[in-house]
Amino acid sequence: METMIDSLTATRAEVNDVANSVMDGADAVMLSGETSVGKYPVEVIRTMTNILRTVESSELIVVPQEAPNIRTKRFITKSICYHASQLAKGIQAKAICTLTNSGYTAYQISAWRPSSHILVFTSNKRILTQLNLLWGVKAFYYNNLNSTDKTVTEINQIAMKMGYLEEEDMVVNLTSMPIEEKGMVNTLRVSIV
């Protein structure tokens, strides 16, 4: 979008570059000079947003749909994230809520591009900003890990207060059980809030 530093119109090649980044699965795109020293910072953001929305909503975008099948150390977590995304689509869940310590679960869910909100709760302040750059992810600080049941109830209530869920919405919750065992999501639960 570099020509938009001085021009209201992007070149065909620039539009193609932005579109290809979406088709390649990029979670985020970045502008630099276009908004910091450019003559049309608002217009360049509008143009890029329009390109991104158009390409993301295209039927030409194909998200891989094959379930994980290589039994690595993270096989259970990967499988649960995959099935959470599929289940959320099937039951039209409004959100997938998960806890994470490293961010791995958020990366996995985001990769499947579910239509549900991806709400990620972590006690690791270092990764909050990184998580919010992932496709579809909204990350929140949460540090009250008492029991799995209580935690699921609390994060669903937080999601309601933040406007991501309403009463009677379905939500897919991912946690580790016991909850003290951080690092390995092994539980998928469907709730109606």
Whereabouts are the PLM-identified features?
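Nucleotide-binding motor/catalytic cores of P-loop/tubulin-like NTPases across gene-expression machines
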Residues: 105-107, 113-151
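Long, charged amphipathic helices and adjacent flexible linkers at domain junctions
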Residues: 48-85
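Conserved, mostly hydrophobic/aromatic
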Residues: 21, 109, 171
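Glycine-rich phosphate-binding active-site loops on the catalytic face of alpha/beta enzymes
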Residues: 18-41
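C-terminal helical cap(s) of enzyme catalytic domains, especially alpha/beta-barrels
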Residues: 35-57, 187-190
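C-terminal binding/interaction regions
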Residues: 160-174, 178, 185-190
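Flexible, glycine/charged-enriched surface loops at secondary-structure junctions
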Residues: 32-33, 38, 57-67, 94, ...
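Active-site mouth loops of central-metabolism enzymes
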Residues: 1-13, 70, 74
